Every structure is written in structure tokens, then in C-alpha cells.
UniProtKB/Swiss-Prot annotation:
Family: Belongs to the hepadnaviridae P protein family.
UniProt remark on domains: Terminal protein domain (TP) is hepadnavirus-specific. Spacer domain is highly variable and separates the TP and RT domains. Polymerase/reverse-transcriptase domain (RT) and ribonuclease H domain (RH) are similar to retrovirus reverse transcriptase/RNase H.
Positions of the UniProt region annotated as Terminal protein domain (TP): 1-177
Protein name per its UniProtKB record: Protein P
Region (Disordered): 186-273
Binding annotation for Mg(2+): D428, D550, D551
Domain Reverse transcriptase stretches: 356-599
Residues covered by region (Polymerase/reverse transcriptase domain (RT)): 346-689
Classification via PROSITE patterns: RT_POL
Amino acid sequence: MPLSYQHFRRILLLDEEAGPLEEELPRLADEDLNRRVAEDLNLQLPNVSIPWTHKVGNFTGLYSSTIPVFNPNWKTPSFPDIHLHQDIINKCEQFVGPLTVNEKRRLNLVMPARFFPISTKYLPLEKGIKPYYPDNVVNHYFQTRHYLHTLWKAGILYKRETTRSASFCGSPYSWEQELHHGAFLDGPSRMGEESFHHQSSGIFSRPPVGSSIQSKHQKSRLGPQSQQRPLDGSQQGRSGSIRAGVHSPTRRPFGVEPSGSRHAKNIASRSASCLHQSAVRKAAYPNHSTFERHSSSGHAVEFHNISPSSAGSQSKRPVFSCWWLQFRNSEPCSDYCLTHLVNLLEDWGPCTEHGKHHIRIPRTPARITGGVFLVDKNPHNTAESRLVVDFSQFSRGSSRVSWPKFAVPNLQSLTNLLSSNLSWLSLDVSAAFYHLPLHPAAMPHLLVGSSGLSRYVARLSSNSRIINHQYGTLPNLHDSCSRNLYVSLMLLFKTFGRKLHLYSHPIIMGFRKIPMGVGLSPFLLAQFTSAICSVVRRAFPHCLAFSYMDDVVLGAKSVQHLESLYTSVTNFLLSLGIHLNPNKTKRWGYSLNFMGYVIGSWGSLPQEHIIMKIKDCFRKLPVNRPIDWKVCQRIVGLLGFAAPFTQCGYPALMPLYACIQSKQAFTFSPTYKAFLCKQYLNLYPVARQRPGLCQVFADATPTGWGLAIGHQRMRGTFMAPLPIHTAELLAACFARSRSGAKLIGTDNSVVLSRKYTSFPWLLGCAANWILRGTSFVYVPSALNPADDPSRGRLGIYRPLLRLPFQPSTGRTSLYAVSPSVPSHLPDRVHFASPLHVAWRPP
């Protein structure tokens, strides 16, 4: 008969009527008992032939595709004009005096941030916007393009103009090398005297693979073709005299044909070959329309007219317009032809827009390195969208980048630090990631974009194939007309108006600020905010400022004090160029909500919504049905978060961990489920540790244990020899139960680490409950007063050590009040084990 829940609780010593601990506890280390209990509770799984359950409540397998819901009415969030001051270190020094080495190093990391992937894989532009919502393809396309456009306008993205240049909005940094008159025209006043145009430009620039006529032409008259590369400074200076009137597809060597007259004759042959050439940069003059074609190789190629003053006579050259504007002159093919839509407006605006600033960038191909799509901003805000960027190529495969590790405060450190009687408020940094500037050298690796509406629709619709597109004949133009597209565009026309034209063009953008989809970004953000908080803490030594990623909290003794601190800190952060969202400032009173915990003077507990999730999970948890191990990962993730607040802690979840590790299904027996249910029904706060002097010591040998409690010594023997770690753990449990002390000295590193998951399962669960809230101090064996009793010698007394205990705040570098001068090295080595210094959650 399976083990009843009551009996199981008695075995685990969770009920009062258990016998003396010295007899009962060693029994739990017995392998035979652990095996029998595991069999009774169905914890060691036979290979089950019953089909696995792949969904429990809201938990599906880790790799399942939960289909995100598309919202046609998503609003694109607005981004403030974020510009972090470049001399942020000087500004901080004016505020607080000289910065420490640590703070400077962290701030220098993000001014500017750099990104060096091992290798970068380039993807075709068609993959730029992921077809995540097959029923809302067109709507999603325009919403995403609008989001990208918004980011570009806010100075968060660069727009690739040519292979070697990009434009952006917002204020430039000193490391962004501006291109003055070299690659861009300043308007009609300089048309005659325009400097050499970047002709290898355009959206899809490739090395020329011109037609035979054109290549013969070039070889005979112009000498060898010069390579496509931007002008270096010296050439650029001299290039003023060269009139690059006609945008020839390949660059001519300097000095040949300085005027535009001679090659007017060969425009015809050249325009034929142009169709195969890399595109000429569109819209140097936005008032001229451009035309998009699909060359035989499937690349969109765009042309624009040349102003009459810049070349011979324009009449000899065919006039092309862009894909969108071509509909204006064509006959409607049906009631749902795009011609009807395009004729609604006289002026559809420019084909492209350029930023205020143009900079030179490393060679950037006309490709992307990651796809984008939209999702809800967060579970509580489904009205606004959030852009998801998939740069996962940098985290995969043999060339993956191993991102730097950084310290995340664990629960005990957090409680030691923040559990106090302070008043709290938390600040909301708006678009925190987009504060940190990236060096332009990273642009070629972090590219997003889209191939333009015509190709996007053609790729996704089954009836229209991109076949005979290079001649741009009428049927091909109307291939994309369909009722769905027409209806979608008509609805979108209400939202976006003439922007539909701009958004239907192809575009490539690179990140100017750190994107969220790269593993480097969380590290950089954590470094940045922790450095800023360190500065704030030194400026206001009587207060506490603390951050984890973009979550910044301030604490002060009284509410009035907190408000004045809030004003000062807000002004300081704004002076650095950090944007706060005042509507989202939360005042917590004395119990702070932070990182999923509620932290008050009594300690920490999980937030209410997590407790509700756990209750919900247990309500839906099936009994006696094998659950897919991927679903178990989800369940363990949730239960593991709240495990430190339960009686038995992490050890209670060990059977689940074991099944995940062996990739087996797990079956909950009624007793095990009831045990976990009861565990998570009553949560106990994790209290802050107090400093103190250690008076109680424990030690053990495989055969016996010994305690030193003040001047009293005790010893005992085990029924059978035990592994040394198990014996030491038992001795610590006896010390706690006999003395009630919350501070125990031990010489065993495993006991110190307070991870009881590697012990026999029943013992781990019971020991976790007995030792809950106990702090350990490391004492070397040679100095341990309990060493002699554990070896059976009671007569010999070692003097009691005065071992002070100082609670750790972890390696989160939060509270280390930064000294103004570096401190000298310690005189002597202290015996703090590494396990002790870096506290793990209890």
C-alpha cells in the first residue's frame, strides 16, 4: 500500500510526535528507507508507456510555440529623445567628487558599448520581418515598419544609406565620424558643384555584374574598372571638381570625362545594363519619384531621375517610378486593384527619408542579421506593442559568443541588504536599453530591415511568384493585387496615410543603441545602473539606492526625507540624460516590491501574484499521469522561485530535478502532490541575517558527532559509519536543535553552502527545515572546539573562539560604500571559504 501523507510527514519529522532527534534523524540518511519511500511515492520512474501530458494549466513545454496574439490596434510606444551625455564621468564627478576605479570602468564600458561577434551570418532581406501572424501579414508588416521608423526617428537606429555610410536622427557622439559634403548632396544650390556621389549605393548594392555591352564599353573607354569603395579623406577633398552627373552604375576612375556631356550618348546601353546593377542611391532629391524593379536575381533595384542641371538632356533617359507609384499610370486590373488606392492621393511624399546626420560606417552588406516581429508590450499592457529582435545567431552554434557573467543578487543577500525599516520608492527608467550607445563598428553585425512590401507580399502569397519581374510589364505589376491586400491597405491608409508609400520601400537599419535581443545588453545595463547607483549612494550616504537592470529603488528613513531624495536623484539622473517615467514611480511605504519579492523589516516573501500562480498550478496538476519533462521544467521554475520560503526548500523538488535531468516524464503520486501542496500553502519569510559572535560549534567523524555549546561539550556515535558530509550535516542539526542558536561554527564546506540537495532525499528535506534561518561560520578543523568531542575525547578543552559573523550582501557590489582611496591589503588571510563569501539562497 502506498505511503500515506500522514505517515510520510512523520518520517520527515515534520510532525511533533517524533522521537529524539539523535535517533530519528540518522535514520533518514539510510539508503534503504530512501529507496522504499521513493518507490512508494513513485519518485524513481519506470519507463512509462502511457502517453505524456504536454500541458498543465498554462504551462506547456519549454519549446512549444504558444501562438502570440496579433492586435491590429496596437499603438507604437513613443520614445523620448534619449541622449546619454558623453562626458557622464565628468558630470558624476561634479556631483560626487572623484569616482572609484570600479565606477569609471563600468561607465567606460558603455561609452560607447562595443560588440565583437566571432562570425556573423547574413540573411536575405525577405526574412527581415518574421511572418509570425499569417492571418495579418500586411498589417504586421506595416506596424513593424512603423515601429522601426519610430526607433530611427528617436535616434535608436541607423539607416543604411550606402555600403559605407548611414544616417540617423538625434544628437551625434564624438565617435560617430560625420561625413560632410562627401557622400550626400546638400540640395539644389550645390547641384552643379556636387562632389563625387557614392555610386555603389542603394539598398541592394552588390559588386557590378553588368551586361556584356556595358563591360566592353568600360574596358575600352575607361580603362580597368575601379573597385567600389568609399573615398578616403584625401580623395574626398579633391573630388569637388568632379561632376558625377549621371549615376553610372560603376565608378569611373578620376580624371576621365569630367563633364556629363560625352556619356549622354551611351545612356541607353547603360540603362539596360543598369537593371542588373547595384541600385543607385535613391532620393538624393526626394521630389523625384523612384521605381523599384526585381532583377532576375531577385534583388529589388531602384532608380531615380537625374535633375536636368546635372547631366546632358533628360529626355534621352527612360523615366522610372517606384513600385507603389507605378500603379498611378496603369489600368486597374479589378475592383481590388491597388491603382484605386494609389490614385487617392496626389502627393505620396518621398520614397525615402534621410536623417539629420550622416556618418561613415564599416562595410555593411545589403542584408540583415536578425528578424523582427511585434508582441504585446507586457502581459498587463496589450494596447501597446513591443519589438522583438531575434539576434539568436550570436548565442548558437560553434561560433557563439559567451556573454560576460555578472552577479545577480540572491535572495539572502537581497534580504540582508533591503530588509529594514526604510521607506521605499522605485523609479522607472523609460526604454532603459536604448540609453546605452553602441559603437558604429557594431552596425554591420546588428542589422534589421525589410525587403519592401511588393516582395514581402509576393513571397507570402502562393498565387504570385516572382518570376518574370525584371521587365516590369503590366501583368507582373498587378500580380500582387488581391482583395486581401487591398482591404488591408485601405484600412491601414486610415492609420498611416501617405506613410504607406514610404513604408512599402525596402530598408536596412542597424542599431545605434544596444538592442534587447543580444546577450551582451543585460550585462551592460546591469553594469551601468549599478555604477550610477554607487554614485548616488556616495552622494547621499544616509540613504540607500539600489538597482537590478532597469529597476532602481531608493530608500530613506522617513517619507519626507525620501521625497527630497527623490527630487535630487531625479534631477541628477535627468542631467546625465537618463529618462525617467514619472507616471510609473511607485511609492511602496515600508514593504518594497522588488524582483518578484516583497521585502519588509520582517524579511522577504514572494509577491502575491506569484503565490496565486502557485495555487493555480497545484489546482491543475494531474495525479498519476506522466507529465512531459519540459513541462516539469516550467513547474520547477515556478516552485523553485518560492522554494526558500517553504519548510523543506529546494530538496523537496529533487525528484522533479532528477526526472528533468534524465529527460523522463514525471508522475505525481497523490502523497507527493499533497506534500508539495502543504509545503507551498504556508510560506515562511526569509529573515535578514544579523551579525553576531559564534558560541556553538559542531563537528563530526564518519562514526560520531561532537558539539561545543558555550562551555558545555557533548558527543554521540552513529549506528553505522556515514559519509563525512552526511555526518557533518547531522551534527549541525543536533547543534541547532540542542542549543537553538542561529549561528553555528562548522568546518564543512557543503554544510556552509546550505545546499542540501546532494544528500539523501529525506535527510535533505528534514535538515532544511531544522536549519532554516541558521547562519554558518567557517572554523578551521584545527581550531574547532567540537573536534575533540567528535573523536570521543571529552576531557580536553580547546579555548572557545571569538568568531564574529558578518552577514554577506553577496557579490552584487551594491553596498560596498566606495572608498575615496583604495584600501590596503588585509594583514592576514582570513578563513572565509568561497562558499561562505558568496551566499547562496537558503
